[in-house]
Regions:
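ABC ATPase NBD coupling module
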Residues: 15, 69-85, 114
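The feature captures the beta-strand-to-loop junction immediately N-terminal to the Walker
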Residues: 37-39
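Helix-to-loop junction immediately C-terminal to a conserved catalytic motif
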Residues: 52
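Conserved coupling/switch loops of ABC nucleotide-binding domains, chiefly the family-specific signature
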Residues: 58-61, 116
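Conserved ABC transporter NBD signature motif
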Residues: 60-68
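Beta-to-alpha transition at the N-cap of a short helix in the ABC ATPase nucleotide-binding domain
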Residues: 89, 93, 98-100
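Short helical segment in ABC ATPase nucleotide-binding domains corresponding to the A-loop/adjacent helical element
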Residues: 100-108, 118
Length: 121
């Protein structure tokens, strides 16, 4: 489950402040498939980066599963991210690996057991 309540995010630029997210609200239930669509510069990537704590919001709350992302310390956030899947806009795959191996790789280096990796992939 993902719950986003009134989040806002502003960036400082050489020409002034740019408000990229303003009072965004969103609910995604377990099992739902959800996409974020919009024009270039609309804030899609910023929203996703806020959901997993790569960007800090200026205000509002984000809950993913049982974790309030906006209140986690670094260690807690690192552990919470292990249960959050994200596909970056630009990413690289290892040409020498199969699809399965590419998906399993980050789980392996995070210390997951082989049987858990098999289940997640």
């Amino acid at each position: 489950m993902i719950s986003v309540k009134n989040i806002s995010k502003t960036f400082n630029t050489p020409t002034g402040k740019v408000e990229v997210l303003k009072n965004v609200n969103l609910e995604v239930e377990d099992g739902d498939v959800f996409g974020v669509v919009g024009f270039s510069g609309a804030g899609k990537s910023t929203l996703i980066r806020c959901l997993n704590g790569l960007e800090k919001v200026d205000s509002g709350t984000i809950i993913v599963g049982e974790n309030e992302i906006t209140k986690l310390d670094r260690k807690q956030l690192r552990n919470a991210r292990k249960k959050i899947g994200m596909i970056f806009q630009q990413f690289n795959l290892f040409d020498s690996k199969t699809v399965y191996e590419n998906i399993a790789f980050p789980l392996e280096i995070s210390g997951y057991k082989k049987e858990n990796i098999r289940e997640r992939v």
